[in-house]
């Protein structure tokens, strides 16, 4: 072999340039992608206080409240927590647990793990109000009253009294795109915690002794902790619930009738979700038997529960 032939051998081709980096939305794994509601909440904080945020919400809708009625607002502030995955029920319970007396520190991870250990959930979902009640009693140590048959009729007075007494209620409902109640047959089943109530009563029903006016809305009266109330339910013309859920830091004000209708029609799991290959825990009778027409009233004084 000649030296000339060796010198004529071509050099190896250069290595190809590295591929461009993936866009951030593709570089993240599916499990770490942020949902829109998580991105919206990032870097923000909730408005704290029993009445601060509620007053703002009511003020933004002031024209929709008849000044011919006496308006009373009751609320016991619960903190906000943004859910990660289908944890709406456990997050709602975590919020409500902040009203326990005496106070008790409760980690969301404890709720999730206890629910899994008891076979109530696989992914954090809670499709059984009965299981949710047992979980709350077990972990929170409080008494839980589970109502069935819907939020209207005889149950209305029970629910109103509970909220007037500044006690939380866990409500399953169908969640619309703006987190408000809607009617989707259970395909958007979600949990919220109601910690307050706004009542519009007939003129002359209320002694304002324990109901000072709101600073910015003098027609709105705020219940003090020692307020004692007892009116016939027929004197109540309008009812709104003040609620939070795990996809927003903010309180929302919902018409009681709207929540009741949404709660009543929870019939089935979203077929697309049911067939996506993910394991979920469904009670016998499915969503309809597990959630429809049911709410949980948490009695937060755990000392009374022990007695």
From Swiss-Prot:
Main enzyme class: hydrolase
Subcellular location field: Cytoplasm
Any one Gene Ontology BP term: protein processing
Entry keyword Hydrolase: yes
Chain segments carrying region Disordered: 1-34
This protein's GO CC annotations: cytoplasm
Peptidase C39-like, as annotated region: 80-200
GO molecular function: initiator methionyl aminopeptidase activity
Record-linked Pfam families: ACTMAP-like_C
Organism superkingdom: Eukaryota
Biased composition (Pro residues): 9-24
Keyword Protease: yes
UniProt EC number: 3.4.11.-
Chief place where the protein resides: cytoplasm
Catalytic machinery residues: 88
Keywords carried by this UniProt record: Aminopeptidase, Cytoplasm, Hydrolase, Protease
Job of this protein: Actin maturation protease that specifically mediates the cleavage of immature acetylated N-terminal actin, thereby contributing to actin maturation. Cleaves N-terminal acetylated methionine of immature cytoplasmic actin after translation. Cleaves N-terminal acetylated cysteine of muscle actin after canonical removal of N-terminal methionine.
Family to which the UniProt record says this protein belongs: Belongs to the ACTMAP family.
Name this polypeptide is given: Actin maturation protease
Source organism (scientific name): Danio rerio (Zebrafish)
Gene name of this polypeptide: actmap
């Amino acid at each position: 072999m000649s030296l000339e032939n060796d010198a004529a051998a071509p050099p190896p081709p250069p290595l190809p340039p590295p591929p461009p980096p993936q866009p951030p939305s593709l570089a993240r794994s599916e499990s770490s992608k942020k949902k829109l509601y998580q991105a919206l909440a990032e870097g923000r904080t909730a408005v704290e206080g029993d009445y601060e945020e509620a007053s703002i919400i009511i003020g933004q809708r002031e024209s929709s409240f008849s000044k011919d009625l006496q308006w009373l607002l009751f609320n016991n502030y619960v903190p906000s927590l943004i859910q990660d995955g289908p944890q709406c029920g456990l997050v709602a319970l975590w919020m409500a647990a902040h009203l326990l007396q005496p106070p008790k520190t409760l980690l969301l991870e404890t709720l999730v793990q206890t629910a899994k250990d008891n076979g109530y959930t696989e992914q954090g979902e809670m499709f059984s109000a009965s299981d949710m009640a047992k979980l709350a009693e077990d972990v929170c140590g409080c008494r839980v009253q589970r109502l069935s048959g819907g939020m209207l009729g005889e149950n209305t007075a029970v629910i109103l009294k509970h909220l007037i007494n500044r006690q939380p209620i866990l409500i399953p409902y169908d969640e619309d795109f703006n987190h408000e109640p809607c009617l989707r047959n259970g395909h958007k089943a979600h949990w919220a915690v109601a910690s307050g109530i706004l009542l519009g009563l007939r003129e002359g029903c209320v002694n304002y002794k324990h109901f000072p006016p709101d600073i910015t809305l003098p027609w709105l009266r705020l219940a003090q902790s020692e307020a004692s109330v007892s009116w016939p339910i027929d004197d109540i013309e309008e009812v709104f619930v003040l609620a939070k859920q795990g996809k927003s830091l903010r309180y929302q004000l919902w018409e009681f009738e709207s929540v009741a209708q949404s709660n009543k029609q929870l019939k089935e799991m979203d077929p697309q979700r049911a067939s996506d290959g993910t394991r979920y825990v469904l009670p016998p009778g499915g969503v309809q038997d597990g959630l429809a027409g049911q709410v949980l009233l948490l009695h937060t004084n755990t000392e009374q529960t022990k007695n």
